[in-house]
């Protein structure tokens, strides 16, 4: 039987990779102080679970605008407006970042870098900046969501512009159409379903981020949650968590159904 | 000429569906504007003041945030590992081709849907309340967050495997544990590793802000500099976050391409 000859590197490669992974994890675990857990951890966990199973139903609707329904509707309004505005703001960025011609493209490189920066810029910091400009409240949340969403939507929109069939554009130019004709009659109809699909997808994510923006005072359900956690009002925490879970699940389901029909 | 045109009924001719959708969106927008209350003046002075200060980063602050940024990466690594280890059994229980018991399957999937519905920052807030301020809270939040995400990615991968090896092993008399180890795992290892790295990227991004709530990492410095209005230092923190995210994404993308 002939033995397969393997180079030294091929033989030690799996061991080398294992060693690197083990070293990385030894380093990672060394940075986390496991002993720092509070002694009350078990107690608090039980209290939160107890709160989840015995939620404060009275908080659902009070009628003075300080209840769960009101905060959830505000969260949805922030996510919806933010995503809607963002979809329009994104379009120029998407065309800037789309790499539609062969070879190096300066505008696509700049556009893609710009979108990465926007994507990584923490949404909470954006929210705080807008709070400076318009004061605390849901309006600041809307602005933060609409600027932050450009990062991801621009990437997805740009990729769908890159993916379209160029045939119709060339046909319109060949038949004597201007660049504007080629844009409005060929590009826009081709990318519109993808744009709508991604906007809905981004709306699902925006609902999640809008529910945390309240932590810094940018409106929505986050503020009552943090307040309830700080005052150790576990049944209040329970009902708010339940409310968020139901809201996110329903929105994901509805948006998923609409997106299925779009494709 | 008219005869060659396709017949369209009333609803199609007047685009009733599209019209209905547009009116619905318009109503929701009007309602949202009402709710959010966009009548406040936008103060460009205040807004640009922050940018002006951030445009001159305080580089002397950089050494202070190196350690917290590394802690952020450590939290992401440990959280992703714990989340993945938890996700493996659950993803097998949520795959239609492994779990034949419909009841268990739907219970597990329902549970996973609930876990996935909780945003990462809320998990951090809850874990800070449970284990106290520090990186352990971040690890806990990231564990639960990546558990929810990875479980779904994993069970979708398991459901697309080739059933041939599974049937062959079952026919040869293997029990279900042996089938999973020798027929399922080898087929999905590369996809699992790729999804692990993808989740790690998302966790690094998430862990940079978790500290804002006291859950460890560089986010704490975001909170401190912002609340003291030291925007030249905030700029350094943001640049640090940008750098670590770009580096981790780059390494992870490179490895995932090698795995594919």
Predicted segment positions?
Chain A
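Glycine-rich helix-loop "coupling/hinge" segments at transmembrane-helix boundaries
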Residues: 207-244, 263
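C-terminal transmembrane helix and the adjacent membrane-cytosol boundary/short C-terminal tail
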Residues: 14, 197, 238-263
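Membrane-cytosol interface at the C-terminal ends of specific transmembrane alpha-helices
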Residues: 136-187, 193-202, 253
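Generic hydrophobic transmembrane alpha-helix motif, especially the helices
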Residues: 115-149
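Cytoplasmic-entry segments and transmembrane alpha-helices of multi-pass inner-membrane transporters
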Residues: 93-127, 156-159
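Alpha-helical membrane-interface segments at transmembrane helix boundaries
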Residues: 69-77, 111-118, 200, 204, ...
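Hydrophobic positions within alpha-helical transmembrane segments of bacterial inner-membrane proteins
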Residues: 83-91, 95, 99, 124, ...
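N-terminal, non-cleaved signal-anchor transmembrane helix
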Residues: 1-84, 91-92, 96, 100
């Amino acid at each position: 039987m002939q033995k397969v000859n393997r180079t030294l590197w091929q033989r030690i490669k799996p061991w080398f990779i294992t060693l690197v992974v083990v070293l990385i994890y030894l380093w990672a675990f060394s940075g986390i102080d496991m002993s720092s857990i509070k002694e009350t951890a078990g107690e608090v966990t039980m209290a939160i679970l107890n709160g989840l199973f015995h939620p404060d139903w009275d908080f659902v609707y009070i009628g003075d605008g300080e209840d769960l329904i009101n905060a959830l509707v505000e969260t949805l309004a922030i996510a919806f407006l933010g995503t809607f505005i963002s979809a329009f703001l994104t379009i120029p960025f998407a065309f800037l970042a789309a790499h539609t011609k062969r070879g190096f493209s300066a505008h696509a490189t700049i556009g893609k870098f710009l979108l990465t920066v926007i994507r990584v810029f923490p949404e909470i910091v954006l929210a705080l900046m807008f709070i400076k400009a318009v004061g605390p409240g849901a309006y600041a949340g809307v602005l933060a969501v609409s600027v932050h969403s450009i990062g991801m939507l621009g990437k997805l929109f740009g990729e769908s512009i890159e993916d379209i069939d160029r045939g119709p554009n060339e046909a319109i130019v060949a038949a004597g159409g201007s660049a504007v004709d080629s844009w409005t009659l060929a590009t826009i109809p081709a990318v519109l379903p993808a744009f709508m699909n991604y906007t809905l997808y981004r709306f699902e994510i925006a609902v999640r981020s809008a529910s945390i923006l309240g932590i810094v005072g940018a409106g929505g359900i986050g503020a009552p949650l943090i307040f309830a956690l700080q005052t150790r009002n576990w049944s209040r925490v329970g009902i708010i968590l339940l409310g968020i879970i139901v809201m996110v699940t329903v929105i994901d389901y509805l948006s998923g159904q609409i997106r299925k029909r779009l494709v | 000429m008219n005869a060659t045109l396709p017949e369209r009924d009333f609803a199609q001719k007047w685009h009733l569906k599209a019209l209905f959708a547009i009116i619905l969106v318009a109503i929701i927008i009007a309602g949202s504007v009402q709710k959010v209350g966009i009548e406040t003046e936008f103060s460009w002075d205040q807004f640009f003041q922050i940018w002006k200060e951030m445009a001159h980063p305080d580089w002397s602050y950089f050494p202070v945030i190196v350690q917290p940024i590394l802690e952020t990466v450590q939290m992401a690594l440990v959280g992703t590992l714990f989340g993945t280890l938890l996700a493996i059994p659950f993803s097998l229980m949520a795959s239609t081709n492994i779990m034949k018991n419909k009841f268990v399957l739907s219970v597990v999937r329902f549970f996973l849907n609930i876990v996935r519905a909780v945003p990462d920052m809320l998990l951090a807030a809850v874990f800070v309340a449970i284990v106290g301020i520090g990186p352990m809270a971040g690890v806990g939040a990231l564990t639960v967050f990546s558990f929810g995400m990875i479980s779904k990615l994993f069970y979708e991968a398991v459901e697309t495997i080739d059933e041939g090896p599974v049937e062959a092993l079952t026919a040869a008399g293997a029990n279900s544990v042996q089938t999973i180890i020798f027929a399922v795992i080898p087929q999905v290892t590369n996809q699992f590793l790729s999804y692990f790295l993808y989740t790690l990227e998302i966790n690094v991004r998430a862990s940079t802000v978790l500290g804002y709530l006291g859950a460890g990492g560089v986010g704490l410095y975001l909170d401190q500099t912002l609340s003291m209005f030291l925007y030249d230092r905030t700029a350094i923190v943001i640049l640090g976050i940008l750098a670590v995210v770009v580096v981790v994404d780059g390494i992870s993308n490179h490895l995932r391409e090698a795995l594919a």
